[in-house]
Swiss-Prot record:
The lineage of its organism: Bacteria, Bacillati, Cyanobacteriota, Cyanophyceae, Oscillatoriophycideae. It is a single-pass membrane protein. Keywords: Membrane, Thylakoid, Transmembrane, Transmembrane helix. This is Protein PsbN. The keyword DNA damage does not apply. GO terms for biological process: photosynthesis.
Length: 43
């Protein structure tokens, strides 16, 4: 394959992995450890 094709596939794969990990962190089991700054601060 051409180097440009391999590079495009590699960059696309990396972006998909980063997006999947971000969604897992935001909505999966690790989200229980995230704090909400609006709930922590009381007026």
């Amino acid at each position: 394959m051409e180097p440009a094709t391999v590079l495009s596939i590699a960059i696309g794969s990396i972006l998909l992995v980063i997006t999947g990990f971000a969604i897992y962190t935001a909505f999966g089991p690790p989200s229980a450890q995230l704090s909400d700054p609006f709930e922590d601060h009381e007026d």
